Each structure stands twice: as C-alpha cells, then as structure tokens.
Amino acid sequence: SYIYNQFVWNFYWRNVLAANKLLAAFPLETSSNVEKGYVGAAHAFRALMYLDMARMYEYLPTDGTSMPNDAGNDVTNLTVPIVTEKTTEEESYNNPRVTREKMAEFILSDLQAAEENIVYLTESSRALPHLDAVYGLMARYYMWLEDYPNAKTYARKAIDESKLKPMTQEDCLSTSKGFNTLSCWIWGSQLVKENDVVQTGIVNWTSMRLLSDMQHNVLAVRTQ
C-alpha cells in the first residue's frame, strides 16, 4: 500500500525539510541567543526524524530472511539517505542510504547540538522540545545501539529534568487527562482551533498528515 510510504514522506521528510530550512536561515555563529534556542529545537526535531527512519528502514539479519534480496542487493545495516541544510540539489541526485554507523554519528551530532543550544529556548510549550526531550532522545538513541548503561543514564536524566512522574492507571484511562493532556508529556503535539484537523473535523488516522503540517509550521515559521 502507498499509505505507509506516504506517511513517511509527508511526516518525517517534511519535518527534516523544516529543520533544514531553519538551520540554513540561522547559522549558529551569527545567531542571537533567542535564535540559538530554535536552532537547538531544529536539531532535536531532525534527530527524532532520522532516529525513527533509521530504525524503520534498517535491515537486520533474521532467521527468516537473507541477503542478497530478490533484487540482488545486500542492504544489511543500511538506513536512509542523510539530507542536511548543506546538501545541494546536485548532491541529492546521488545520495544513497547510509550505514547504521554513519547514521549513528550524524544523529549523535544533532543531539549534541540540540543539548548545547536548546537551553536558550525561551518558549515553555511542550509542543517544542526542551532539554528533557533531548535526554529522552539520547536514551532512545543508545537503546537502538544496544548501549544499555548510557540508555539508563539518559533515561534518568530525562525523568529528572522533566520533573514528571509516570502516569497512573487512572491517568492512562482518563478521557480528560493523561494521554489527552500535553502537560503529562515531555514532548507532544498541541492542536489549536486554526489547525486543519480542527477545522475539518477529520479526527482519525488521516489527521496524522495534518498533524505533520502543524509540526512543519512550528519550525518553518521561524525562518520567516
């Protein structure tokens, strides 16, 4: 089905595009402290997108499959192409999938840049990432690499920095709090009346594309 690929294109790659536009518009060396906060957020957004896509597309050996595949290619440990704010149109024509190792280096560099600059972010809304979210992404990153001691360390940092507590069963099952309250999350999406998903009333799986528009606009507006 095209739906799966459409979701990846509309959500993940559009968020990568938004982050790249912001990073291109605000070079760190000439940015004010306020702008550095958004630079940090852009790095966190991009790290999240690539971490998800790397795990989705990476082929790992299993008992039921083997390489080369039916097309005669060995795609073991290949993730997705890396596109940054510095990637030219010409370079994009020959930009193959990168290995797990190269992707891990790239994601870590984004997370380190996010950790360094996101402390300047003045907006408190959890619709944008903050230091606790960066630590949470670090924990997820190290889980992917099976580095469990570091995953544990950063998971604890995320919890301590967020000052949140795990939800109770009552919170999880409630229709008015828990999963439905942004304040219970380290990082989430916040719908407002102007969003298409509210205007159209399409509150179902299809609305995920509209949610991607919202995430896209959160970053893209900073370049205007």
Please provide the spans of the model-predicted regions.
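Structural signature of alpha-solenoid helical repeat junctions
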Residues: 31-38, 45, 78, 103, ...
